[in-house]
From Swiss-Prot:
GO terms for biological process: cellular response to UV-A; negative regulation of catalytic activity; negative regulation of endopeptidase activity; negative regulation of membrane protein ectodomain proteolysis; positive regulation of cell population proliferation; regulation of integrin-mediated signaling pathway; response to cytokine; response to hormone. This is Metalloproteinase inhibitor 1. Keywords: Disulfide bond, Glycoprotein, Growth factor, Metal-binding, Metalloenzyme inhibitor, Metalloprotease inhibitor, Phosphoprotein, Protease inhibitor, Secreted, Signal, Zinc. Residues 24-147 form the NTR domain. Zn(2+) binds at C24. It comes from Equus caballus (Horse). The modification Phosphoserine is found at S178. The gene is TIMP1. It is found in: Secreted. Disulfide bonds join C24-C93, C26-C122, C36-C147, C150-C197, C155-C160, C168-C189.
Amino acid sequence: MAPFAPLVSGILLLLWLTAPSRACTCVPPHPQTAFCSSEFVIRAKFVGTSEVNQTTLQRRYEIKMTKMFKGFSALGDAPDTWFVYTPAMESLCGYFHRSENRSEEFLIAGQLLDEKLYITTCSFVAPWNSLSSAQRQGFTKTYAAGCGECSVFPCSSIPCKLQSDTDCLWTDQLLTGSDKGFQSRYLACLPREPGLCTWQSLRPRTA
């Protein structure tokens, strides 16, 4: 049975990674949700070619980390160069990196398993330069303030009703048909007072 252990582990990993996505039918999350639900959030460059392990059915990418926003306790004083793992096939929610620019920085949010970094096509992976200045501020320091107490509640069809005073109604998809609307690009769901969370602007205030 020993020779089959890596294959079994690989299949179990694929099921674990893809179960929430319902066979890759992913609803893009608000960036704050991506931050709070991920075990690591980093800024990094994809510097190596992808390699596929046919035994575990995993693809891995070599990355060079330039900034860590979340995951300090797990990653600690980690080296700058890491491998990020994903299912080998896109049909199994595997992430396929299409950019060939090795100097381009990406925001990568994913999960940790056995001290390895894992992402899927449902993970939040985006060019750093494509994020608004407000989103960059959110990932750098502000989104963390809403984790645990506040929740972004997606509204894609009417009627929508908040479940709690600590929820913020996310209507970008409903109003614009896109997950990259105003609330996604410029707002965070943060505590206003004990037991109450509201949308708050991340844009710098001008005098």
